Design a protein with these regions (language model features):
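Glycine-rich beta-strand-centered segment in the early N-terminal region that forms part
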Residues: 21-39, 46-87
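Adenosine-nucleotide cofactor-binding segment
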Residues: 137-140, 152-225
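ADP-ribose/adenylate-binding Rossmann-like module
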Residues: 233-250, 265
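C-terminal substrate-binding/catalytic core of Rossmann-like NAD(P)-dependent dehydrogenases/reductases
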Residues: 199-206, 248-298, 308
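N-terminal Rossmann-fold NAD(P) dinucleotide-binding loop
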Residues: 144-145
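NAD(P)H dinucleotide-binding glycine-rich loop of Rossmann-like/cofactor-binding domains
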Residues: 80-138
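Residue-level marker of beta-strand positions
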Residues: 6, 30, 60-62, 80, ...
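C-terminal hydrophobic helical "lid"/dimerization subdomain
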Residues: 2, 227, 277-339
Length: 339
């Protein structure tokens, strides 16, 4: 019986590597992939802190096809592929429809497709203003900067906001035209609750239509960033929420969301057809350099240091933007790929 290593949780914040049976192809359209990398996603961080025994993680894997069923036509043995689940072990078996081939000019760590298709899907859903108008992105980590790069490609000017100065530098690097700490935002970028009492109505209406942004994308996930994003959205504008995945409830100003008639859009990727098309689109754009979001500082950890990778998510700012675990190599000191 062939075996493989698998990462499972022993409890909150504590994982272990166990040995299990390697999956075997038993359907004609299945492929077997030997993993190289799996991304460490912030959306799993809260669940990692509260994980019960036996819980597994890893939805950002990539690797090499080592075996295919007799009916497989999309990929062949030796192809590098990425997918959206099953990154918690050395090998993964899945139907060929769930794998996406990585272009030859894209490095392994650059070809982790799941977060990239989430970005393409999210930006495809938003209501963009005309070219050269300003939109805002609140939260400028890996996902926020990816969204900034795509929005800039679409011809709008992006104003970036984050609580970390290092993240603002990244935002400017990936396409933002302006970048601010929350307390430094210009007055005209923040909307106010207007009751129309004691003011000229025409002036009030004009002010409501000119302050804030017609589109704000939120990638910070905290109550503070969500609340700020609401206050930055113009009357009748659109607030696109991309990062609120896990954790408890958030206390935000829903009243302002309502009285300003803000269109609130969840960009969470739940449409399988759109996810597939977004993944294929992302791979094409990376392959032909239409989308230059490949050169992202990435820290690599051995699978045995999965917990350390999560611990360091909160101190990465200004040092690296993305973390991955390496299933091919063991017992090495974590290092940063800064290309």
């Amino acid at each position: 019986m062939a075996t493989m290593r698998k990462l499972v949780m022993k409890g909150p914040k504590e994982s272990e590597i166990i040995t299990v049976e390697r999956p075997v192809i038993n359907k004609p359209t299945e492929v077997l992939v030997k993993l190289h990398y799996c991304g460490v996603c912030m959306s799993e961080h809260y669940d990692w802190t509260t994980a019960p025994a036996g819980r597994t993680f890893g939805h950002e894997p990539m690797g090499t096809v080592v075996e295919v069923g007799e009916g497989v036509t999309r990929v062949k043995v030796g192809d590098r592929v990425s997918m959206g689940a099953g990154g918690g072990a050395e090998y993964q078996k899945l139907d060929e429809k769930w794998v996406h081939k990585i272009p030859d000019n894209v490095e392994d760590h650059q070809g982790i497709i799941e977060p990239l298709w989430c970005l393409v899907s999210a930006v495809s859903k938003v209501r963009l203003p005309i070219q050269s108008e300003k939109v805002a992105v609140v939260g400028c980590g890996y996902m926020g900067c990816g969204a900034i790069s795509l929005l800039a490609m679409r011809g709008v000017k992006v104003v970036a906001v984050d609580i970390n100065p290092e993240s603002l530098k990244n935002a400017l690097k990936y396409g933002a035209c302006e970048a601010y700490l929350p307390e430094e935002l210009p007055e005209e970028y923040i909307t106010t609750r207007n009751t129309y009492k004691g003011v000229d109505v025409d002036s009030a209406v004009k002010n409501a239509a000119s302050t804030g942004f017609p589109l704000v994308m939120e990638w910070g996930e905290t109550a503070e960033s969500l609340d700020l994003a609401i206050r930055m959205t113009r009357q009748c504008g659109q607030l696109a929420i991309g990062a609120y995945h896990t954790g408890g409830k958030r206390l935000v100003d829903v009243q302002l969301l309502n009285v300003r008639a803000i269109d609130c859009l969840s960009t969470h990727p739940r449409e399988q057809d759109l996810n597939f098309r977004s993944a294929e689109c992302a791979m094409r754009m990376l392959g032909d350099d239409t989308w230059s979001y490949k050169h992202v500082p990435t820290k690599v950890y051995p699978a045995s240091m999965f917990d350390k990778a999560h611990e360091e998510l909160e101190i990465k700012f200004g040092k690296w933007m993305k973390a991955v675990i390496d299933w091919e190599n063991e017992d090495f000191e974590p290092y940063i790929i800064n290309d």
